[in-house]
């Protein structure tokens, strides 16, 4: 009897130790994002609405800064613990001496579209023709800004010859174009689909599909990721793993979800007043989400090449792209 009691006690201790080891070091944390309603960041909303964060023992407060550059600034400044943002931010920050790393890929295609006001259709044939125009982006310094910089440089122009205006990622972005406050817009769905439906714009460059992404970049180009300061990752490995687990569950759910399933899960405000249009935008964007959560070496190189096209300092920098992505957490996810 005593032996059985001792064995039972030992087993209980082991279970307790295992549970303690698996528990997140920091259960309550803040996460920044730059335009949460955008389909670019849909995995975040799915993880939140489906309760995947809570299932991993996390209490996540989400702060929407309206643009990716602002959420990055919040991470650097210490006001958020993690960011759902563009992968290229990890590359740019390494050049600046900031060790920020992605831990899971959420989007395998950018999904960004450069569209121009319909009245300019006759004279704008390439991004270089945007010279002297006002271009709306989610926020200056965001991935939507980089996208235009790259396209202009690729077409032989200079991005300094246009004016970038932050218009956000929702109804405000649509209104800015409809009111004539901007001549072109670099944004994502559902904003772009809304403007297309209204025939307010025509599309100049579209990275919502694999074919479109290859036409623009010559190959794959990772988009949204979850990134954190490497110092946080090293000090909070269980918290990081829990975050990755939650986002991976969201990717798995999205892999088989129908547009109606997505519409039933997200807040109604995401529809921009048109549920049918939103579901059509979801349908057009389903191809963009990562299937594995892993960023390939080719994807890293493609993202770097995009930035180097218009950033001379980055082009000359000696960067180690392997330090922009930590793959061990995705590999540790229980499939």
Language model segments and positions:
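Short, glycine-/small- and polar/acidic-enriched structural segments
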Residues: 23-169, 179, 183-189, 200, ...
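Conserved C-terminal helix/tail region of periplasmic/extracytoplasmic solute-binding proteins
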Residues: 301-335
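Pocket-lining segment of extracytoplasmic ligand-binding domains
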Residues: 172-267
């Amino acid at each position: 009897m005593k032996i059985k009691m001792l064995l039972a006690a030992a087993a209980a201790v082991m279970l307790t130790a295992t549970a303690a080891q698996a528990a997140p070091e920091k259960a309550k944390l803040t996460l920044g994002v730059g335009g949460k309603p955008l389909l670019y960041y849909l995995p975040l909303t799915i993880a939140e609405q489906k309760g995947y964060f809570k299932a991993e023992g996390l209490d996540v407060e989400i702060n929407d800064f309206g643009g990716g550059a602002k959420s990055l600034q919040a991470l650097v400044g210490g006001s958020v613990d993690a960011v759902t943002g563009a992968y290229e931010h990890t590359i740019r920050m390494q050049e600046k001496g900031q060790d920020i790393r992605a831990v899971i890929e959420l989007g395998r295609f950018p999904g960004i579209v450069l569209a121009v006001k319909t009245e300019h259709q006759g004279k704008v044939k390439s991004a270089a023709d945007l010279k002297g125009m006002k271009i709306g982006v989610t926020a200056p310094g965001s991935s939507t800004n980089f996208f235009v910089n790259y396209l202009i440089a690729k077409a032989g122009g200079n991005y300094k010859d246009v004016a970038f205006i932050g218009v956000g990622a929702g109804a405000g972005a649509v209104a800015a174009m409809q009111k004539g406050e901007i001549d072109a817009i670099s944004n994502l769905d559902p904003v772009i689909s809304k403007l297309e439906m209204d025939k307010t714009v025509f599309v100049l460059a579209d990275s919502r599909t694999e074919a479109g992404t290859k036409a623009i970049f010559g190959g794959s180009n990772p988009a949204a990721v979850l990134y954190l300061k490497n110092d946080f990752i090293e000090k909070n490995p269980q918290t990081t793993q829990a975050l990755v687990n939650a986002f991976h569950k969201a990717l798995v759910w999205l892999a088989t979800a129908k547009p109606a399933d997505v519409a039933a899960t997200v807040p109604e405000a995401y529809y921009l007043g048109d549920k049918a249009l939103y579901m059509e935008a979801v349908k057009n964007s389903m191809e963009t989400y990562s299937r594995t959560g892993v960023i390939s070496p080719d994807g890293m190189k493609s993202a770097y090449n995009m930035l180097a096209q218009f950033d001379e300092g980055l082009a000359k920098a000696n960067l180690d792209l392997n330090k922009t992505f930590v793959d061990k957490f995705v590999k540790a996810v229980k499939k």
